């Protein structure tokens, strides 16, 4: 069993029940899924760029990404409907906990001038969004093989009803929020 999942079952549930006075343990918010999205705007001109992004995303998450396609045509971007423009991965279960553990313990501390993640990036429904400027913070990415530094969006979807509950859940997992 993953370290974070074990921590959730033992400490986190107990702490949240005490803090929010839940009548049942089943009311405690959980992390439902983590969606990692990498938008590749250069893919319009060069399809090889998208292949590199897909490969890197697969290394980072350990799961094959889904190639996202344009929903509408936009003439100013020379973009047609159905053109591949990015990649995304939805992580659930064991892989989700492994990714979150790696993100909190290894990757985020490797960010340059890191003071913590934003406290205000919650969406009002208990989901947290985090933007990463470069894929090099992940240990699986080899610096010499990177052709272009790319960022990504990481969305942590929880079953929490409020942002306060979600913030407390992530804080208990060890998410380093700014003071």
From Swiss-Prot:
Q: What does this protein do?
A: This is one of the proteins that bind and probably mediate the attachment of the 5S RNA into the large ribosomal subunit, where it forms part of the central protuberance. In the 70S ribosome it contacts protein S13 of the 30S subunit (bridge B1b), connecting the 2 subunits; this bridge is implicated in subunit movement. Contacts the P site tRNA; the 5S rRNA and some of its associated proteins might help stabilize positioning of ribosome-bound tRNAs.
What is the protein name for this chain? Large ribosomal subunit protein uL5
- InterPro entries linked to this entry: Ribosomal_uL5 (IPR002132), Ribosomal_uL5_bac-type (IPR020930), Ribosomal_uL5_C (IPR031309), Ribosomal_uL5_CS (IPR020929), Ribosomal_uL5_dom_sf (IPR022803), Ribosomal_uL5_N (IPR031310)
One record GO biological process: translation
An example Gene Ontology CC term for this record: ribosome
Subunit note: Part of the 50S ribosomal subunit; part of the 5S rRNA/L5/L18/L25 subcomplex. Contacts the 5S rRNA and the P site tRNA. Forms a bridge to the 30S subunit in the 70S ribosome.
Keywords, ordered alphabetically: Ribonucleoprotein, Ribosomal protein, RNA-binding, rRNA-binding, tRNA-binding
Q: Which family does it belong to?
A: Belongs to the universal ribosomal protein uL5 family.
State the encoding gene: rplE
Organism of origin is Staphylococcus epidermidis (strain ATCC 35984 / DSM 28319 / BCRC 17069 / CCUG 31568 / BM 3577 / RP62A)
- State the HAMAP family in the record: Ribosomal_uL5_B
Looking up PANTHER family in the UniProt record yields:
60S RIBOSOMAL PROTEIN L11-RELATED (PTHR11994)
